[in-house]
Amino acid sequence: MEKILIVGGGYAGFYAAWGLEKKLGRGEADVTLVDPHGYMTYQPFLPEVAAGSIEARHVMVSLRGHLHRTTVIAGQTTSIDHAHRTATVRTTDGAPREIAYDTIVVTAGAVTRTFPVPGIEQEAIGLKHVEEAVAIRDQLLTAFDRAALLPPGVGRRRLLTVTVVGGGFTGVEVFGELLSLATSMLRAYPELSRDDLDFHLVDSNDRILPEVTDEPGRWVVRHLEKRGAHLHLGTQVVSAADGRIMLSTGESYGNGLLIWAAGNGSNPVVARNTDLPVDERGLVRVRADLRVGTSDAPVPHAWAAGDNAAVPDLAAAVPGARAVPNAQHAVRQGKLLAKNLVADLRGKNVQPYLHHSLGTVATLGIGHGIFQYRRLVITGFPAWLMHRGYHVLAVPTWERKIRVLLVWVSAVIFGRDIIPLSTVQRPRAAFLAGGDPFAGSDGEHPAVRPAPHDRPEPHDRPELSVVRDAG
């Protein structure tokens, strides 16, 4: 029996495994999927999770709950030795384990791209995982509670200052959603005003949303600025140490919440720990039919798709173009990969990946959005509805579609839930505190400890000396 190993349970990996279960006959192949989590995260919904418009668990699809004929292993693939048909996996107990296979499917996805900027490691939160979206929401909600206790001034404004680094879809969407959340929360905090909010979007390029054309991109900039946001284009963050943002323009300001959404980096298992061919960006070289290799040098029994693969875009007007790493492509590549794998096992012809874009749509907060399909551009409320309609259809399984719809309906009727869940991160705190709800996890009262951003000004602090290499 053919042993198929799928590395990664994101869009491409999940849909490939799901498709194989539907198409393979009994006893035709033994499929194993390895992923650090027991679920697939529908990442386009993470900005709305961060803003409290969607419940965190509703954007997660259980792998074991839907892949009944696939062996699911909770672990991190650390290396792939295709010459010997083995992969090394570090399971949840920390022990390394070798898995033998006949055919491998590499769908490990990408990681957040970082840079050696002082303070990023200590201050920033990414947005590729549900845990990060929940942490962003909790930090902003908690900041409102703390700010309401302070008099108007620098301290209050610093707590309610949000900086998002990255002007792609993830960065712009979470920026718009958090701006919408913060503005709506002012109704529940009469002590605060719109002047206390300070939102900054920073991108090194001269424009945002590179997936849309210039004029829609400029419209988004104008729209966000009208809502009181500050956009710093053609600008880089040179330091985020000690809760203070310093920009390449020389501007600096105190910051409360820093979100890093500056694009994707190659997955380490693909970039550095495999004998499969990779390109200069650390992506697996893939043919149009999703086999690993090139037309001149195919690699037998190896397939790849999704964000960790350089998949040729046959629909692009530019020769040699690669498919954009997004959910739309990853889902369709995963479905085709399952079809091609089964066809290859049965000695039939495989098909090239050819997908014409259905358009580009982004949320900018409740009631705000933008959609573009070729020359057609729709903005505002209709585009926001299109965003929700498209993604509720795209999220896998009817169970998840219904749950998301119900949450949206309840939010329309009752408004967004603004209760932070930060105490969930310290489940034993109340037990150790002996009934004092304000005691910390060690039983100590937080009033005796400085809050994360109650820090001295830069001239009173030593320079940061440890910087992490770019990932």
Regions found by a protein language model. Give the residues of each.
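C-terminal, flexible cofactor-proximal segment of oxidoreductases
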Residues: H329, Q333-G471
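Short hydrophobic core segments
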Residues: V7, I99-G109, V237, Y253-G263, ...
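FAD-binding core/adjacent interface of flavoenzyme oxidoreductases
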Residues: T71-T163, I259
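A Rossmann-like FAD-binding core segment of flavoenzymes
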Residues: D30, T70-T86, L179-T294, V350
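Rossmann-like dinucleotide-binding core of oxidoreductases
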Residues: R156-V212, W219, H230-H232, A323-A343, ...
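Beta1-alpha1 glycine-rich phosphate/pyrophosphate-binding loop at the start
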Residues: M1-S79, V162-T163, F169-V212, L385, ...
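Short glycine-rich anion-binding loops that position phosphate/pyrophosphate groups of nucleotides
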Residues: A12, G109-T112, F175, N264-S266
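FAD-site-proximal beta/loop scaffold in flavoenzymes
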Residues: Q122-P152, G243-I245, S252-R332
